[in-house]
């Protein structure tokens, strides 16, 4: 039951009505028996500064940040973590010492399955990343953290690819990072130990689309990991095609759950988060069980 003592968490975005975050966070809060509630806050870009001041005034403990605010919120925060600085985006904000502090848990979300269920020695391995937008930044940083020998980012716009590459110039990641246009994929796919889709191609409602065709995936190594950040539909065409070549498939639902787990650890200041409950709540909500 919500009372005057209930502590507030939430997610800000525009739109935010379809966010899955309240489903999994409230399931975890209920399982833990805590007097918290996690709410969606639809906030238009023009209202962002006023909105986060208001969230402070009403005592919000912390909040998630989604599109289109992940970059725009940075100058409005008192402090951001080195991880958020490197990625250039914030997805988790916490109230500390009467100030807003931002970080990014997308890296933790992305690498979690690669450190647990699918753990291997990545130091001699090659990662190929499709897309060079905001999501790709977290994936690049995650691959570097895992120790990949080579990280290849593939995009369609030469100018944006160069901007992406130069944005890492002051980071040790630059040594491992190469960028390529889409026509180079025929050479990269056979080398890939990890192939990640960070593009929206294949996301609902365009469920019949894939960033790569069956022919382009034909030379993917058996046992390579295909990882799609999309979680609706499940599985995507990209993952279905990769599995037909003998690849191991990971979808975006696990990343969503694990970045949420990392955020709850920060807000609740405890390590014991019921990840299975969060995963099951999402699967049930999406009609996957």
UniProtKB/Swiss-Prot annotation:
Keyword Nucleus assigned: no
Active site: 70 (proton acceptor)
A single BP term in Gene Ontology: aromatic amino acid family biosynthetic process
Any one GO cellular component localisation term in the record: cytosol
Catalysed conversion reaction: shikimate + NADP(+) = 3-dehydroshikimate + NADPH + H(+)
Keyword DNA-binding: no
EC code(s) of this entry: 1.1.1.25
Signal peptide region: none
Superkingdom of this protein's organism: Bacteria
Example of a GO MF term: shikimate 3-dehydrogenase (NADP+) activity
Binding site for shikimate: 19-21, 66, 91, 106, 231
Sequence positions that bind NADP(+): 131-135, 229, 252
Keyword vocabulary terms for this entry: Amino-acid biosynthesis, Aromatic amino acid biosynthesis, NADP, Oxidoreductase
Pathway(s) the chain acts in: Metabolic intermediate biosynthesis; chorismate biosynthesis; chorismate from D-erythrose 4-phosphate and phosphoenolpyruvate: step 4/7
One matching Pfam family: Shikimate_dh_N
PANTHER family: BIFUNCTIONAL 3-DEHYDROQUINATE DEHYDRATASE_SHIKIMATE DEHYDROGENASE, CHLOROPLASTIC, SHIKIMATE DEHYDROGENASE
Similarity remark: Belongs to the shikimate dehydrogenase family.
Subunit relationships: Homodimer.
Function of the protein: Involved in the biosynthesis of the chorismate, which leads to the biosynthesis of aromatic amino acids. Catalyzes the reversible NADPH linked reduction of 3-dehydroshikimate (DHSA) to yield shikimate (SA).
Name of the molecule in the record: Shikimate dehydrogenase (NADP(+))
Originating organism: Trichormus variabilis (strain ATCC 29413 / PCC 7937) (Anabaena variabilis)
């Amino acid at each position: 039951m919500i009372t005057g003592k209930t502590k507030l968490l939430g997610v800000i975005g525009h739109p935010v009505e379809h966010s899955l975050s309240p489903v999994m966070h409230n399931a975890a809060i209920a399982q833990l028996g805590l007097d918290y509630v996690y709410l969606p806050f639809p906030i238009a870009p023009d209202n962002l500064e006023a909105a986060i001041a208001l969230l402070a005034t009403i005592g919000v403990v912390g909040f998630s940040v989604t599109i289109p605010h992940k970059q725009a919120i940075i100058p409005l925060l008192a402090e951001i973590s080195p991880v958020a600085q490197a990625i250039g985006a914030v997805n988790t904000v916490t109230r500390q010492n009467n100030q807003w502090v931002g970080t990014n848990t997308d890296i933790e979300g992305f690498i979690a399955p690669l450190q647990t269920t699918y753990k291997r020695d990545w130091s001699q391995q090659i990662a190929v990343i499709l897309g060079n937008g905001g999501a790709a930044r977290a994936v690049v940083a995650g691959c570097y953290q895992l120790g990949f020998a080579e990280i290849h980012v593939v995009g369609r716009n030469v100018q944006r690819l160069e901007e992406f590459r130069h944005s890492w110039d002051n980071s040790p990641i630059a040594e491992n990072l190469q960028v390529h246009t889409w026509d180079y994929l025929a050479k990269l796919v056979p080398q890939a130990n990890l192939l990640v889709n960070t593009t929206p191609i294949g996301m609902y409602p365009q469920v019949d689309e894939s960033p790569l065709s069956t022919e382009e995936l034909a030379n993917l190594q058996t046992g390579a990991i295909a990882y799609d950040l999309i979680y609706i539909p499940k599985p995507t065409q990209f993952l279905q095609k990769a599995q037909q070549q003998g690849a191991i498939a990971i979808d975006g639902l696990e990343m969503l759950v694990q970045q949420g787990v990392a955020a709850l650890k920060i807000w609740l200041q405890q390590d014991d988060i019921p990840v299975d409950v969060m995963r099951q709540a999402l699967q049930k909500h999406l009609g996957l069980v």
